[in-house]
Amino acid sequence: MKNLNIRNEKKEDYRAVENLIRESFWNVYRPGCLEHYVIHKLRDDVDFIPELSFVMELDGEIIGQNMFMKANIKADDGRDVPIMTMGPICIAPEFKGKGYGKILLDYSLERAKEYGCQALCFEGNINFYGKSGFTFASNFGIRYHGLPE
């Protein structure tokens, strides 16, 4: 894994990153994808954390991406519990299954922890994230608003 670099995403990277996300998620969970559009819109959200938006480069080419947002969980007692959300993390299709995703995930989580992240919720493939210790939010009584337990 020579010439591997993870750095903060720059505005000049946005188009390349959105194309990468589209390629990475195309026809994975549904016909086509919308993750690239979601990222495009989230960057303008007040809860977007630019300091925690990363790209992974291999020999100067962007092959991976991850980002974080501020969020809250509304507790049953009415409290707001500050958390972060993450993703979608992605790796270029030709580099999937080679350990790059795990490297990017570990790096991203360490930076988020340094930034003050104490809890994290996101949607993703449990087969990938479970290897890093993640489990279902429902195990902690966390659910989408309005959905039954």
What are these regions (language model features)?
Residues 129, 134:
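Conserved active-site tyrosine of GNAT-family acetyltransferases
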Residues 123, 135-149:
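Conserved catalytic-core motifs of GNAT/GCN5-like acyltransferases
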Residues 9, 124-125:
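Conserved acidic functional residues
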Residues 110-124:
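Conserved GNAT acetyl-CoA-binding A-motif
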Residues 1-12, 19:
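Conserved N-terminal entry element of GNAT/NAT acetyltransferase domains
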Residues 95-107, 117:
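Conserved acetyl-CoA pyrophosphate-binding loop and the N-cap/start of the following alpha-helix
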Residues 78-93:
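Conserved acetyl-CoA binding element of GNAT-fold acetyltransferases
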